[in-house]
Amino acid sequence: TTVAEGVELAKAVVAASAEVPADVKLIIAPPFTHLYPVAEVVKGTAVGLSSQNCADHVKGAYTGEVAVDMIAGVGCQYVILGHSERREYYGETSATLVEKVKLALAAGLSPIFCIGEKLEEREAGRHFEVVTEQVKNVLFTLTAEEMAKVVVAYEPVWAIGTGKTATAEQAQE
């Protein structure tokens, strides 16, 4: 999307947010290049703003990386971590994710921690094991106070871009 398209989408989400129950939090996560203009749109509204990732370093010469203080500084309250695409294509490990989660929390951001299994893991009956390991390896390193600031997002990897969707029962498992 272009920045203009991102801004228009943010305006539409803000307008629609009036119809959302008070106990539901709407959060949008545009690309990094759209964060500032979208932050201006959602500022002062009930709509939260998230980055799609963060660096695993606070400062330093890491060309192309975006540190948590930069993300918080632009107005984000959240950061998506552990997305299946980051795990698969960028080799993000549990150790990397522990570091990112802790950096995000230290910067005042709430991590949106993604968990989910691949199709072959579900078909082999290993989905509980896989998701449990993802949670245990990263989130069990946190204190109860830190954990209270984390949003866990279940996203079955086998449903991404395949046209297949998880049933309500599968999501509730």
List each model region and its residues.
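Active-site loop-to-helix "anion-binding N-cap" substructures in soluble metabolic enzymes
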Residues: 1-173
